[in-house]
Curated annotation (Swiss-Prot):
Its EC number is 3.7.1.3. Belongs to the kynureninase family. The modification N6-(pyridoxal phosphate)lysine is found at residue 244. This is Kynureninase.
Amino acid sequence: MTDLLSRAHADALDAADPLRSLRDAFVFPQHGDRDQTYLVGNSLGLQPRAARAMVDEVLDQWGTLGVEGHFTGPTQWLTYHQLVRDALARVVGAQPGEVVAMNTLSVNLHLMMASFYRPTHERGAILIEAGAFPSDRHAVESQLRLRGLDPATHLIEVEADEPNGTLSMAAIADAIAQHGPRLALVLWPGIQYRTGQAFDLAEIVRLARAQGAAVGCDLAHAVGNIPLTLHDDGVDFAVWCNYKYLNAGPGAVGGCFVHERHANSDLPRIAGWWGHEQQTRFRMDPQFVPSPGAEGWQLSNPPVLALAPLRASLALFDQTGMAALRAKSERLTGHLEQLIHARVPQVLQIVTPAEPMRRGCQLSLRVAGGRAQGCSLFEHLHAAGVLGDWREPDLIRIAPVPLYNRFSDLHTFVGQVEAWAAA
């Protein structure tokens, strides 16, 4: 009988994997004469092989047509951002008109808060999770100060209440209920970046809206990682980056969702010419007439060269579907969890929740012995060509991505942990 935790079994799982050929669609950094064991797609996804051809297509069109490339050629730049719209909508569970690729995450967060954070004398507080990604916290604090409000009184942080530093739904519900009459906005992640915990966004929306608060989401670690249903959940807005699980390259164009109930609203916004309705944009009229839906929040014409790699990656998502990717992801992360518990339980503590519905692909790991030991292991892994990432003060994050990671990669990782522990 095959040992279910053996490398031979992992190799058999890889051979039987219906998605195994997707790995060939990506370029892997090299370690000596082999591919790196790349388990850091939660920080930067790998380059799709098709990305180079799509970037070259834009360069060729620029060289051949010059400015006319905006209106002629195989991919007109006037509407290039719409080439990724439908696929992005499928990834996040939205209607096509509810999404747009533009700017970057933090810029989009400020744009959304300018419209959806509408403080009054009685209702001006913003609720976030304690330990939120620093850029989100910076954005929230600065928005409060721009409105003449003090973060000390108007920024409410929900503290972790579970042993590993994660948050129960009960704690979130209690905070929303306790502060409900003061809340103007609940800003919540799809997945918490340090712990890897996934949240029930539909329930958070239900609780917040019952109190009269708007709801926005940072989906940086959720988009392309777990299935999302933003339209059905009723989120007011969401923002994300496309360089992690959506593999659009370093500093890639971000994404934004605005629920269709706001499509033709008179919400105040920070406006720019590319958000003006397309049919009359080039009349250059002084009055701003927003495009319906999320596109009405655009400022400038999109960076076409930066959108090209996103097109390449989204084609793979359309080819495969989030359901199939999620099924493999649960198996990969579950296998990693089993290996850690069976082979290195005295070395690694898993911080991320064990329930599959409360996590994505990432496991956040704390090394026994404290920060110095964690740094030592991280450096050992890097030297061995096994890439995760480090998050202060003491976590190693490992993210097996179903598009390109294998079950055997997880054995390589655990084997290197064992080698370090035995040294």
